[in-house]
């Protein structure tokens, strides 16, 4: 098992290329089950979850090749089972449920794993697919789904759900008739999936709004499609510029999709501007100013940036408040930040942060993907040496993060524990 050793206190300066979005790439890879012809997907990040997904697609009967950020997927005779050994490490694996039912009318998918940040149930996925004609049972930890032919339906989600929207969107493109999805997730990654499906011949309208309409087609065809840039990785690097008092130019940065994050970072004293196709971020206030954040579905402040902005709050002047309204148990990074000298008090879904003058390097342990990023940010700003352990979480969502940060002045090395 690896750890990152970080020597803090160095302002980061230079440029970073933002990778393709993991959260967009994963559903697009599963959607590649749907066409009967080969598809090519570009700008795919080199991440553990990506390779786990490709291994799962191979088990399901696809031929997959990954090289230099490009994936070519050739569909074969599909098999229905997504085994536990692959699914246990990654929640997104449940996204093969809709495509398998649409293509072959059956699926046997192990209940998924992934980050341990509270209950993220799949009940809305199943309820929607049942309205389209599927039936389900749970046996020995597997969701077993069957259908003759999915048919269009008018489905309203109880609450916006990214995974549920994506699963039903993929199922509906090959369903018979029209499907209307209401109260859907607005996240850009959902829009990217819809755009990929349209590139393959799907008939979809309304993506990016609360109501998506799909007219089922009999088949999808080949396409080449670039994955959108990763807004959470970009937000993390913006935060890195702020917490170290540096200046970073991010290339391939999704500025519009980061509006809620950029507004908060500006309120803390950062200057963030568009520079052509890039975004320039620098810290203008020393120290940063405290702010309040409430996580919300897009276009609100993303829960996947909550841990990172909390790291900045730890060194900001005055008090800050974080309200986590999306997931429970997503404050597990708090105790680790406190080991470094942060002053944080948690009450239910709210964390109150009082800024301190300095953080001190310490051994810390990552509990999930974004908590890992928070601890790396804290380590970059801390005095002394920080060891971030259990970084396999980090490798699930950040492409070569230590190489990118070292290229702009950080002092990070990967070691075996």
Swiss-Prot record:
Subcellular location: Cytoplasm
Primary localisation category: cytoplasm
GO molecular-function terms, A-Z: UDP-N-acetylglucosamine 1-carboxyvinyltransferase activity
Residues annotated for phosphoenolpyruvate binding in this entry: 22-23
Top EC class, one word: transferase
GO biological process terms on file: cell division; cell wall organization; peptidoglycan biosynthetic process; regulation of cell shape; UDP-N-acetylgalactosamine biosynthetic process
TM region(s), chain numbering: none
Sites where the protein binds UDP-N-acetyl-alpha-D-glucosamine: 91, 120-124, 304, 326
Gene3D superfamilies cross-referenced by the UniProt entry: Enolpyruvate transferase domain
Family the UniProt entry places it in: Belongs to the EPSP synthase family. MurA subfamily.
Function statement: Cell wall formation. Adds enolpyruvyl to UDP-N-acetylglucosamine.
Name of the protein this chain belongs to: UDP-N-acetylglucosamine 1-carboxyvinyltransferase
Gene name per UniProt: murA
């Amino acid at each position: 098992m690896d750890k990152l050793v970080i020597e803090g206190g160095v302002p980061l300066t230079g440029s970073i290329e933002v990778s393709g979005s993991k959260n967009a790439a994963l559903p697009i890879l599963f959607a590649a089950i749907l066409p009967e012809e080969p598809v090519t997907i570009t700008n795919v990040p080199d991440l553990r979850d990506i390779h786990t997904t490709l291994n799962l697609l191979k088990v399901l009967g696809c031929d997959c090749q990954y090289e230099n950020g490009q994936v070519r997927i050739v569909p074969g005779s599909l098999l229905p089972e997504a085994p536990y050994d692959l699914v246990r490490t990654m929640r997104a694996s449940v996204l093969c449920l809709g495509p398998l039912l649409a293509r072959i009318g059956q699926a046997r998918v192990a209940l998924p794993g992934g980050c341990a940040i509270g209950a993220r149930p799949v009940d809305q996925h199943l309820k929607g697919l049942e309205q389209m004609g599927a039936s389900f049972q749970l046996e020995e930890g597997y969701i077993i789904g069957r259908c003759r032919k999915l048919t269009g339906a008018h489905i309203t989600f109880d609450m916006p759900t990214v995974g549920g929207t994506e699963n039903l969107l993929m199922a509906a493109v090959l369903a018979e008739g029209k499907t209307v999805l209401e109260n859907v997730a607005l996240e850009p990654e959902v829009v990217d999936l819809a755009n990929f499906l349209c590139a393959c011949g799907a008939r979809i309208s309304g993506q990016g709004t609360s109501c998506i309409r799909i007219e089922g087609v009999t088949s999808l065809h080949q396409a080449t499609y670039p994955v959108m840039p990763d807004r959470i990785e970009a937000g993390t690097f913006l935060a890195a510029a702020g917490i170290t008092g540096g200046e970073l130019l991010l290339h391939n940065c999704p500025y519009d999709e980061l509006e809620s994050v950029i507004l908060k970072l500006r309120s803390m004293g950062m200057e963030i501007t568009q520079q052509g196709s890039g975004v320039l971020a620098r810290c203008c206030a020393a120290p940063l100013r405290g702010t309040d954040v409430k996580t919300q579905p897009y276009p609100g402040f993303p829960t996947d940036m909550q841990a990172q902005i909390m790291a900045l709050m730890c060194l900001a002047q005055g008090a800050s408040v974080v309200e986590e309204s999306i997931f429970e148990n997503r404050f597990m990074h708090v105790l680790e930040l406190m080991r470094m000298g942060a002053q944080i008090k948690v009450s239910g879904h709210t964390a109150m942060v009082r800024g301190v003058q300095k953080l001190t390097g310490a051994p810390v342990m990552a509990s999930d993907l974004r908590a890992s990023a928070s601890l790396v940010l804290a380590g970059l700003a801390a005095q002394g040496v920080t060891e971030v352990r259990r970084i396999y979480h980090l490798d699930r969502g950040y492409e070569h993060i230590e190489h990118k940060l070292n290229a702009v002045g950080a002092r990070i090395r990967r070691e075996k524990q």
